[in-house]
C-alpha cells in the first residue's frame, strides 16, 4: 500500500463558544468572575479571558497562577491557591455555568448556512470545547433547538489532556472515520484551540472577531468604526501569531472561501504540516 496526500477536506472540527454559538464568548467569561467572587476574590473580565480555550479546571489553575490573582487570594485565605482550592472554585463554577449557559446560547450569524454548505460538499462536522461534558450536554441540547447538531462532540474531560493538547481534535478524527489528519480543518477563536489543531496536524482557522479576543456582542462588532475594526484585527492577529494559524478570518460566516482555498492547496499537493 502506498501513501497519497488527501485531495480535499473530509472534516471540519468546530469549537463551540465564540465559534458557532455565543458571539463574544460571554458565557464562560462571566461565570469565572462570579465563581471567584464567591470566594471573595476579584478577577476582572480581561483576566478571565486570558486562558480561554483551555479546559475549565486548567483555566482556573492558570488564573490562580497569575501573581495578581494569587496575591488577592492570599489576602483572603492567608496562602496562595493550591490544587484543592482550584477544585473548590471549579466545583462552584460548574453549577453556575450550567445554570446560566442558556443566556448565551444563540447561534452566531451565518453559522447554520456555512455548516449546511460544508455538509453539501461532503465535509463531516466534528466539534470540541473547553467545557466539560456536564456543561456540553446542555450546550448541545440548546444548539439543537436552534437547528445545529454536530456529527460528533468531544468535551474536555472526555480525553486525558485538553487543549492545547491535540487529543480532542484527534478523538473527532477517530469517531468520524477520517483517514488523514491533513484532510481536516480546525476552526477556533482561541490560541489553545489553534495549537490543538496544529499539534493534531490539521489545517487551522482562527476566528478573530466572534470570540474571546474581541469580546464584543455581534451588535458591538457590527457597530465598530472601520478604522477601529482594522486596529482590533491587527491587535488580534498579533495575539494568534505564535500559534501559527493557517488562516485568520472575522467569523464563521467567512469560512467558505477558506475551505475552497484549502481544497485547492490540497489538490496541488500542499499539506498543513508544511505551512
UniProtKB/Swiss-Prot annotation:
Q: How is the cofactor bound?
A: Binds 1 Mg(2+) ion per subunit.
Enzyme Commission designation: 3.11.1.1
Instruction: Name the Gene3D superfamilies on file.
Output: HAD superfamily/HAD-like, Putative phosphatase, domain 2
Under the heading InterPro entries, the entry gives: HAD-like_hydrolase_sf (IPR050155), HAD-like_sf (IPR036412), HAD-SF_hydro_IA (IPR006439), HAD_sf (IPR023214), PGP-like_dom2 (IPR023198), Phosphonoacetald_hydro (IPR006323)
Disulfide bridge map: none
List, alphabetically, the Pfam families matched. Answer: Hydrolase (PF00702)
The residues that the entry says bind Mg(2+) are 15, 17, 189
Highest taxon above the source species: Bacteria
What does the record give as cofactor? Mg(2+)
MF terms from GO for this chain are: magnesium ion binding; phosphoglycolate phosphatase activity; phosphonoacetaldehyde hydrolase activity
Which residues are the active-site ones? 15 (nucleophile), 56 (schiff-base intermediate with substrate)
Q: Which reaction does it catalyse?
A: phosphonoacetaldehyde + H2O = acetaldehyde + phosphate + H(+)
Keyword annotations from UniProtKB, A to Z: Hydrolase, Magnesium, Metal-binding, Schiff base
Output the CDD domains linked to this UniProt entry: HAD_PHN
What GO terms in the biological process aspect are recorded for it? DNA repair; organic phosphonate catabolic process
Assigned GO CC terms = cytosol
State the protein's purpose.
Answer: Involved in phosphonate degradation.
Tell me the PANTHER family matching this sequence.
PHOSPHOGLYCOLATE PHOSPHATASE, PHOSPHONOACETALDEHYDE HYDROLASE
Family, per entry: Belongs to the HAD-like hydrolase superfamily. PhnX family.
Write down what this protein is called: Phosphonoacetaldehyde hydrolase
Amino acid at each position: 500500500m502506498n501513501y497519497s496526500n488527501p485531495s480535499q477536506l473530509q472534516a471540519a472540527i468546530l469549537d463551540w463558544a465564540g465559534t458557532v454559538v455565543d458571539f463574544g464568548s460571554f458565557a464562560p467569561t462571566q461565570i469565572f468572575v462570579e465563581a471567584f467572587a464567591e470566594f471573595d476574590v476579584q478577577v476582572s473580565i480581561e483576566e478571565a479571558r486570558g486562558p480561554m480555550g483551555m479546559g475549565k479546571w486548567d483555566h482556573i489553575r492558570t488564573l490562580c497562577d497569575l501573581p495578581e490573582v494569587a496575591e488577592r487570594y492570599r489576602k483572603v485565605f492567608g496562602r496562595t491557591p493550591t490544587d484543592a482550592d482550584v477544585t473548590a472554585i471549579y466545583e462552584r463554577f460548574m453549577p453556575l455555568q450550567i445554570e446560566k449557559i442558556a443566556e448565551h446560547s444563540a447561534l452566531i450569524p451565518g453559522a447554520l448556512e456555512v455548516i449546511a454548505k460544508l455538509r453539501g460538499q461532503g465535509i463531516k462536522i466534528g466539534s470540541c470545547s473547553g467545557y466539560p461534558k456536564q456543561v456540553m450536554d446542555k450546550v448541545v441540547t440548546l444548539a439543537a433547538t436552534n437547528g445545529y447538531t454536530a456529527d460528533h462532540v468531544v468535551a474536555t474531560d472526555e480525553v486525558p489532556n485538553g487543549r492545547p493538547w491535540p487529543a480532542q481534535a484527534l478523538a473527532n478524527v477517530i469517531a468520524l472515520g477520517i483517514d488523514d489528519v491533513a484532510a481536516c480543518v480546525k476552526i477556533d477563536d482561541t490560541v489553545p484551540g489553534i495549537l490543538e489543531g496544529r499539534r493534531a496536524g490539521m489545517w487551522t482557522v482562527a476566528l478573530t472577531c466572534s470570540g474571546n479576543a474581541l469580546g464584543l456582542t455581534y451588535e458591538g462588532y457590527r457597530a465598530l468604526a472601520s478604522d477601529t475594526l482594522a486596529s482590533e484585527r491587527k491587535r488580534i492577529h498579533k495575539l494568534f501569531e505564535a500559534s501559527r494559524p493557517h488562516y485568520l478570518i472575522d467569523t464563521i460566516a467567512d469560512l467558505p472561501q477558506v475551505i475552497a482555498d484549502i481544497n485547492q492547496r490540497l489538490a496541488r499537493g500542499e499539506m498543513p504540516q508544511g505551512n
